[in-house]
Amino acid sequence: AAGMGFFGAR
């Protein structure tokens, strides 16, 4: 789970 979470937080 390191796709939407990363881009979402950024």
From Swiss-Prot:
Annotated GO CC locations:
extracellular region
Q: Which domain of life is it from?
A: Eukaryota
Please classify the protein's predominant subcellular localization into one broad category.
Answer: secreted
Q: Does the keyword Plastid apply?
A: no
Q: Which residues form the signal peptide?
A: none
Carries keyword Membrane? Answer: no
Locate the Arginine amide modifications and list their residues.
R10
A biological process (GO) annotation for this entry? neuropeptide signaling pathway
- What is the name of this protein? Urechistachykinin-2
Q: Which organism is it from?
A: Urechis unicinctus (Fat innkeeper worm)
Annotated function: Contractile action on the inner circular body-wall muscle of the animal.
Compartments reported by the entry: Secreted
Record's keyword terms, sorted: Amidation, Neuropeptide, Secreted
